[in-house]
Structure formats: structure tokens, C-alpha cells
């Protein structure tokens, strides 16, 4: 169904609010490097309806307020043999990359999510944690609708709309975010992201 500007703005406002409220919780995921840059956050996360209303349109009802800004960031993921990985509380169930319509690349995560869940005989009702790349609020909302996800489980500590979209690092950031949430709380979680050309990738993790 159609996703209007009000829905997009509300999702973006929520992403900023959740990120702001989760700063202390998310601090454990950050490894400080020898720089002062990480101490200076240029974004207040104080997005509201008034700011959204003043935001310039990019295309249609997509605006600068409900679009992730370009950002610099990095995330570290280590690849190991199967045995060391099984010693950790968070277990890799599987991951897939699937192809979709190259003219609708933002919807590609839907097929990837469905595929990886089918492979493991799971459905969305079994998920307790969901991380989706929100390059645009409309894209995140469309993927939530298309994959039948519970929006209350998606990006519960904010997403790229609040933190920015560091292209080439965004997927690893989702994986790190999901890993830490599952390690802290247990459950089954999925992270999904789109890429240019209609590529969708999804990662499925579990923690007892």
C-alpha cells in the first residue's frame, strides 16, 4: 500500500528518538580509536514534526528529513572456522544474498528475509530482533510491510536515519548491532540490507 510523508516522517523521528535514548546501551559496541572524532557528534537526534515539515523534498514525499545522511563509520566483523564460532553465545544460523528487481533495489531485502527464514523453517513470528538498513524511511517501511515484520521489533535502538549511512560499512554495522542485542537479550534475530542492482542480503542469528 502507499506510504505517505506523514508515515515516513514519523518513522524518521522515531529512529532519532530511539538512537538518542539508547546512547548508553550502544556504548558497549564502540571500540574507541586514537582520535577525538568519536567524541563529537554533529547530529542532535532532536528531529521533530516541525523540522520534518520544513525539510526540502528530494523526490515526491521523500525529503532530507526522512533520508539517511552520508556518514563516515566502520564496523569490525571477524571470520572464523566453525568450531571457534560455536563456542560463543550467539550462533550463526545462516545468511543469503538474493537478486531482485534492479529498478526497485530498496525492496530486495524482502526476498532475502523470506529466503533465509524458509531455509531454516522459521517465520517472522519467531523473530525477536530485526535490523534493517533504513537508507530511506519509505524503504524501511516498505520492507517491513512486504516481509510481514513487526515494526516494534525493527531497529529498536535507532537506525541509519539517525546515525547516517556509511556506504560499504552499513551492512557490517547491522550485523554488529544484531550480535550485541542478541548477546545481551537472547532470541532469534535477522539483519537485512539492500545493495545497488537489486541485491538483497540477510543474516540470521540466534542466542540462547
Predicted regions and their residues:
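Cysteine-centered functional microenvironments
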Residues: 1-2, 10-11, 60-69, 128-130, ...
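Conserved active-site and cofactor/substrate-binding residues in soluble primary-metabolism enzymes
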Residues: 3-14, 43, 47-50, 65, ...
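N-terminal extracellular/periplasmic Venus flytrap/periplasmic-binding protein-like
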Residues: 7-89, 146, 151-153
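Condensing-enzyme catalytic core mediating Claisen C-C bond formation in acyl metabolism
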Residues: 49-111, 115, 119, 176, ...
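Structured core elements
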Residues: 77-78, 131, 190, 204
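Active-site pocket-lining segment
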Residues: 93, 99-162
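Internal helix-turn-beta structural module
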Residues: 141-146, 150-155, 160-205
Amino acid at each position: 500500500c502507499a506510504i505517505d510523508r506523514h508515515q515516513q516522517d514519523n518513522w524518521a523521528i522515531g529512529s532519532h528518538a530511539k538512537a538518542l535514548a539508547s546512547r548508553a546501551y550502544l556504548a558497549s559496541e564502540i571500540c574507541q580509536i586514537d582520535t577525538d572524532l568519536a567524541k563529537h557528534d554533529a547530529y542532535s537526534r532532536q528531529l521533530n514534526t516541525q523540522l520534518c515539515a520544513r525539510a526540502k523534498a528530494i523526490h515526491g514525499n521523500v525529503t532530507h528529513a526522512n533520508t539517511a545522511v552520508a556518514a563516515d563509520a566502520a564496523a569490525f566483523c571477524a571470520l572464523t572456522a566453525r568450531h571457534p564460532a560455536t563456542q560463543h553465545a550467539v550462533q550463526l544460523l545462516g545468511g543469503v544474498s538474493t537478486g531482485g528487481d534492479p529498478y526497485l533495489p530498496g525492496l530486495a531485502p524482502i526476498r532475502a528475509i523470506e529466503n533465509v527464514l524458509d531455509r531454516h523453517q522459521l517465520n517472522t513470528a519467531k523473530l525477536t530482533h530485526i535490523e534493517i538498513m533504513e537508507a530511506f524511511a519509505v524503504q524501511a517501511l516498505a520492507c517491513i510491510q512486504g516481509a510481514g515484520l513487526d515494526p516494534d521489533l525493527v531497529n529498536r535502538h535507532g537506525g541509519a536515519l539517525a546515525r547516517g549511512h556509511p556506504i560499504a560499512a552499513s551492512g557490517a554495522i547491522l550485523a554488529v548491532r544484531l550480535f550485541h542485542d542478541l548477546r545481551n537479550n537472547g532470541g532469534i534475530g535477522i539483519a537485512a540490507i539492500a545493495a545497488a542492482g537489486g541485491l538483497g542480503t540477510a543474516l540470521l542469528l540466534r542466542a540462547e
